[in-house]
Amino acid sequence: MLELQRLTKTYATGDTALREVSLAVPRGQVVGLIGPSGAGKSTLIRCINRLVAPSGGRILLGDVDLAAVGRAELRRQRRRIGMIFQEYALVERLTVMENVLSGRLGYVPFWRSFTRRFPGRDIENAYRLLDRVGLLAHADKRADALSGGQRQRVGIARALAQEPALLLVDEPTASLDPKTSRQIMRLILEVCEERDLPAIVNIHDVPLAQQFMHRLVGLHAGEVVFDGAPVALDETVLATIYGAEDWASSGREPAPEREPEDTERHLAEVGR
């Protein structure tokens, strides 16, 4: 279970991105984060995995407060957090199988990770995961030969290879067509239910969020202004969340809120 208690983020400029955000995500529940540009959705995800240090509050993953741990313990805890990225974050020249196995880098000795010699158990599990996401036949294909939807499936398998206690998903369908977007969202929902995983999904597509999320949390100016079932998301609630912004065409968070090296930083920390 993930629990956020009065999580706050204020930057050195004085700008407050998150204002005492409190919410709990039980095991097996998939929560969608919605809101206008600059609402704090990406900042919230970056605070949870500590790519950004929160200014206050607690981040409880099980009985561990991620906001309070030191660097060494944080590296260990990041193994428990699976990340699925909009940009896929695959190593293009490596095979699909090698990319999935990279999710195990934080669990093997340095010499094994350097030579990419993984235990048999990890390899067998990677094959099972590729079968689950529908890519078993592509195990030996290079990542750069895959379609966008296939690359995202590899990203899902890699995150699951970590055997995480939490999934953080950052706009997984922003680069995909509508049909593939539905397939990816359905897959994320299914694997979380199968593994009893809590998940938070930053999603800009409101109708897609209403269709697939167990629960929706609406952010506006860094505050939670809605927390409830998708069926409760009516025009009045949407106006509260989005204000004057057209929610039907709401785009991604602005560039300043997501640093370009975030993906590499997370994967590097997991692999240490």
Swiss-Prot record:
The gene is phnC. It comes from the Bacteria. Part of the ABC transporter complex PhnCDE involved in phosphonates import. Responsible for energy coupling to the transport system. Residues 248-272 are annotated as: Disordered. ATP binds at G35, P36, S37, G38, A39, G40, K41, S42. The keyword Transport applies. It is found in: Cell inner membrane. It is an enzyme of class 7 (translocase). It comes from Chromohalobacter salexigens (strain ATCC BAA-138 / DSM 3043 / CIP 106854 / NCIMB 13768 / 1H11). Residues 2-246 form the ABC transporter domain. Residues 254-272 have a biased composition (Basic and acidic residues). One of its GO terms (molecular function) is ATP hydrolysis activity. NCBIfam families: ABC_phnC (TIGR02315). The lineage of its organism: Bacteria, Pseudomonadati, Pseudomonadota, Gammaproteobacteria, Oceanospirillales. Belongs to the ABC transporter superfamily. Phosphonates importer (TC 3.A.1.9.1) family. Keywords: ATP-binding, Cell inner membrane, Cell membrane, Membrane, Nucleotide-binding, Phosphonate transport, Translocase, Transport. Pfam families: ABC_tran. InterPro entries: AAA+_ATPase, ABC_transporter-like_ATP-bd, ABC_transporter-like_CS, ABC_transpr_PhnC, MetN_ABC_transporter-like, P-loop_NTPase. Its EC number is 7.3.2.2. It catalyses: phosphonate(out) + ATP + H2O = phosphonate(in) + ADP + phosphate + H(+). The complex is composed of two ATP-binding proteins (PhnC), two transmembrane proteins (PhnE) and a solute-binding protein (PhnD). This is Phosphonates import ATP-binding protein PhnC. GO terms for cellular component: plasma membrane. It is a peripheral membrane protein.
